[in-house]
């Protein structure tokens, strides 16, 4: 009995050892994840990326809670999906909507503190400049400055690892050592630019070029309130204009006058970007035109691909047709080729001067359409190309749905004397419409945001005339947003692009809701 108890006593710790290891490994991994993400959060916060830091905290806290608690064991399986949805859908959406209420652009990217720091780092030359030469002596390097025909030299110093910030200049009769080439000065420009040289008369000079030192002083001085800047050159007083996101001169009454000073900083401007969309005719008119074209393009694409796909599916399902498998394979091939390759091939085929399509049309009918310069022909070309890209998908769907329709229905209709039109309208379409509806809605939504087709085929062109932001006749809303964000006439206007993207989100959401309700009514 004692031996059995002794055996149990010996095996108990051994049995619990693997469990202890698992616990240790588990908490070690969780601790490592927490520490790394905590460090990343600190870095983001220190650089002013508060939104990304907050996102990291939320995702990390959720992960530690879910994987660290036994009560939330079941949630471990859905956490990756939830985290992905937050990271790739909810956060970008919220971030985009947030940017829509700011002036964030290529000219207004910095925070207020960073923009102020950039202005305070600016300097200007307040006095004469003096040529200098860098000499290499046996003991080290020496800077020699020429002032009014007199040579002034610094003490000898070691250029490698140079950390001095103040050096006194003393008169010399002749420079010693060899002159360093310009590439040495360029290589060590950062170290040399941080040096203040003290002239015998008490003036300080700093490096103002690759060959000159000059009396350089700060352009702006920060006042006691921590916001106002004083221009030492023009004696102007500047204050931050929180309505436009720039420093701007003010008069004696504190009113903003004159031009703004770059760089700008990000400020909240409320609904100004949305008001620009509706009030600025240079934005409103192309926006409405592009919105209508986007709806028409998406709808026509769905209709054309469905009609062609259904007809071809019916043909390749025809039992009397020989070689159906070969035809089926050939018709599916466009779907197998990557879309961007097909688009670029069509771009060459539709070339107005050397494209094979225009050569064929000119040879047969004597016409040469302006596919890329005429708005109507450009839209026609886009529909042709997109139909080519999309009909194999619809054909595959229709082939499967046609197979699912019982032959008994067609046999019964044949007994009643129905023709193929009656069969199509009374049997085929009703049987196919219900399963096809969600797929047609998905196809409409995909083409609503078909950025790749527009960007690769026409780039949105031909361009509209008289618009405030770049816009083209073949632009979709998504490509229009892209052009505002990255090709804006006044620079990259991310705030306005975010406002347009927010409107697109609301429009697509409304269309999806309407489609779902219509589908539900049709099913009922």
Curated annotation (Swiss-Prot):
It comes from the Bacteria. The keyword Membrane applies. SUPFAM superfamilies: MalF N-terminal region-like, MetI-like. It comes from Vibrio parahaemolyticus serotype O3:K6 (strain RIMD 2210633). Gene3D superfamilies: D-maltodextrin-binding protein, MBP, MalF N-terminal region-like, MetI-like. NCBIfam families: PRK10999.1. It holds the Pfam family MalF_N_TM. The chain crosses the membrane at residues 23-45, 50-69, 82-104, 291-313, 326-345, 380-402, 436-458, 494-516. Residues 46-49, 105-290, 346-379, 459-493 are periplasmic. It is found in: Cell inner membrane. The complex is composed of two ATP-binding proteins (MalK), two transmembrane proteins (MalG and MalF) and a solute-binding protein (MalE). GO terms for molecular function: ABC-type maltose transporter activity. Belongs to the binding-protein-dependent transport system permease family. MalFG subfamily. Keywords: Cell inner membrane, Cell membrane, Membrane, Sugar transport, Transmembrane, Transmembrane helix, Transport. It is a multi-pass membrane protein. This is Maltose/maltodextrin transport system permease protein MalF. GO terms for cellular component: maltose transport complex.
């Amino acid at each position: 009995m004692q031996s059995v108890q002794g055996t149990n006593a010996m095996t108990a710790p051994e049995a619990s050892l693997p469990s202890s290891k698992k616990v240790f490994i588990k908490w070690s991994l969780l601790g490592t994840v927490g520490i790394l993400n905590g460090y990343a959060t600190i870095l983001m916060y220190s650089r002013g990326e508060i939104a990304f830091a907050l996102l990291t905290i939320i995702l990390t806290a959720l992960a530690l809670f879910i994987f660290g608690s036994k009560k939330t064991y079941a949630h471990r399986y859905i956490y990756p999906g939830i985290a992905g949805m937050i990271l790739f859908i909810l956060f970008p959406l919220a971030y985009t909507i947030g940017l829509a209420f700011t002036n964030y652009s290529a000219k207004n990217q910095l925070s207020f503190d960073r923009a102020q720091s950039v202005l305070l780092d600016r300097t200007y030359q307040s006095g004469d400049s003096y040529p200098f030469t860098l000499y290499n002596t046996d003991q080290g390097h020496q800077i020699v400055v020429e002032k009014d025909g007199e040579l002034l030299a610094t003490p000898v110093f070691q250029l490698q690892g140079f950390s001095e910030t103040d050096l006194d200049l003393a008169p010399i009769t002749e420079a010693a050592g060899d002159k360093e080439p310009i590439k040495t000065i360029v290589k060590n420009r950062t170290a040399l630019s941080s040096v203040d040289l003290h002239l015998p008369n008490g003036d300080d000079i700093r490096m103002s070029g690759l060959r000159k030192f000059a009396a350089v002083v700060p352009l702006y001085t920060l006042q006691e309130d921590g916001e106002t800047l004083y221009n030492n050159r023009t004696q102007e007083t500047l204050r931050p204009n929180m309505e436009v996101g720039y420093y701007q001169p003010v008069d004696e009454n504190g009113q903003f006058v004159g031009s703004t000073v770059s760089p700008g900083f990000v400020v909240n401007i409320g609904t100004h970007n949305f008001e620009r969309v509706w009030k600025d005719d240079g934005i409103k008119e192309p926006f409405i035109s592009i919105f209508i074209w986007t709806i028409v393009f998406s709808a026509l694409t769905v209709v054309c691909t469905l009609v062609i796909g259904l007809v071809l599916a019916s043909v390749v399902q025809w039992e009397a047709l020989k070689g159906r498998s070969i035809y089926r394979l050939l018709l599916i091939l466009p779907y197998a080729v990557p879309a961007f390759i097909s688009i670029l091939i069509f771009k060459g085929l539709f070339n107005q001067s050397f494209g094979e399509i225009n050569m064929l049309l000119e040879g047969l009918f004597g016409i040469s359409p302006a596919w890329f310069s005429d708005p109507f022909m450009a839209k026609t070309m886009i529909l042709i190309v997109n139909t080519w890209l999309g009909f194999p998908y619809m054909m595959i769907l229709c082939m499967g749905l046609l197979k699912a329709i019982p032959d008994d229905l067609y046999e019964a209709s044949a007994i009643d004397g129905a023709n193929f039109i009656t069969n199509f309208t009374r049997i085929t379409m009703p049987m196919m419409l219900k399963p096809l509806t969600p797929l047609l809605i998905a196809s409409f939504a995909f083409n609503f945001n078909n950025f790749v087709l527009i960007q690769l085929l026409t780039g949105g062109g031909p361009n509209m005339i008289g618009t405030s932001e770049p816009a083209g006749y073949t632009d979709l809303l998504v490509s229009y947003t892209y052009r505002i964000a990255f090709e804006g006439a006044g620079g990259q206007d991310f705030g306005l692009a975010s406002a347009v993207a927010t409107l697109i989100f609301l429009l697509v959401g409304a269309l999806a809701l309407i489609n779902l309700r219509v589908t539900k009514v049709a099913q009922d």
